[in-house]
Amino acid sequence: MYLGIVSTACAFLLWNHGLQLLNASSGGLFFFFQPLVGTLLGWILLGEQIGGTFWIGSFLILSGVLLVIKEKEKEVKS
């Protein structure tokens, strides 16, 4: 329970800080990192096991965020 509260609070704080630096559509993308942060904190702080599905999911999340960022860069250049 502690880890869930801490990881969620950290994710919200970082997300709110990011919204101050970026516009809402770009900052909203980083909200998808919350499950990654929570799982990694569980692994580091509590010694939880991370399976292969976590790495697959992490890859998909990171790929999706990068894809959207690249598409937005193309729109800005046009």
UniProtKB/Swiss-Prot annotation:
Residues 2-70 form the EamA domain. The keyword Transmembrane applies. The chain crosses the membrane at residues 2-22, 27-47, 49-69. The keyword Transport applies. It is found in: Cell membrane. Pfam families: EamA. Belongs to the EamA transporter family. This is Putative permease-like protein YdzE. It comes from Bacillus subtilis (strain 168).
